[in-house]
Amino acid sequence: MPDTRLSRAGDKGALTELWQAVFGDNAELISAFFSLLCRPEYCRVACADGKIASMGFCLPGPEAMGLKCAYIYAMATAEDARSRGLAAAVGAALIEDAFESGADIVATLPADEGLCAWYETRFGMSPLFKKGGPGVVFPDNWLEFARICGGHDPDTPQRLYAVARGGIDTAGLEDLGWELTFD
């Protein structure tokens, strides 16, 4: 599996460039994300040809029925670096980091239905939380970023995919809504 590393303060420009290239988001949204939600230890990167070619963020903060959750967001790989296992390495490292930091559950909302199987086969994730609605509790900085992002994208899946740390019972979580997906 390719090597990954935690992001560094000097990576912000390269991360912003990759984010814009893959997602097309504007500079205001990306800047708000870095200001409100991101710390270097929440981001993993993989490099190819001497530059950041893949990234992902795993954001702590939400709670579901007393369980600490983390959320994988903005997984992106440069088009010319795809199919090399970079994103899989980044995602695996993010999940490992989250569990080592005390998360009970790591969740994500795949960008489209086609990615659900990718998250399932690479990381053992399965459908869990409902997209939208009450249930999961979020910190204030998440609420602030959500106001900038806007509402849900109707084209994203209706369930978040998640994996629990060993020994964690997820019974009852399938009825909880996860309102802040930033999609």
Which residues fall in each region the model found?
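Conserved active-site tyrosine of GNAT-family acetyltransferases
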Residues: Y119-E120, M125, A146
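Conserved acetyl-CoA-binding loop-helix of GNAT-fold acetyltransferases
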Residues: T77, S83-A98
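Conserved GNAT acetyl-CoA-binding A-motif
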Residues: G91, A98-A111
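Intrinsically disordered, low-complexity, positively biased terminal segments
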Residues: G133-D183
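A conserved beta-strand-loop-helix scaffold within acyl/acetyltransferase catalytic domains
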Residues: T4-S7, K12-A76
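Alpha-helical elements of the RecA-like P-loop NTPase motor core of helicases
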Residues: G13, C116-A117
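Short glycine/proline-centered loop/turn elements that form peptide/ligand docking sites
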Residues: G91, G114-L115, P134-F138
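Residue-level detector of high-confidence beta-strand sites
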Residues: M55, L128-K130
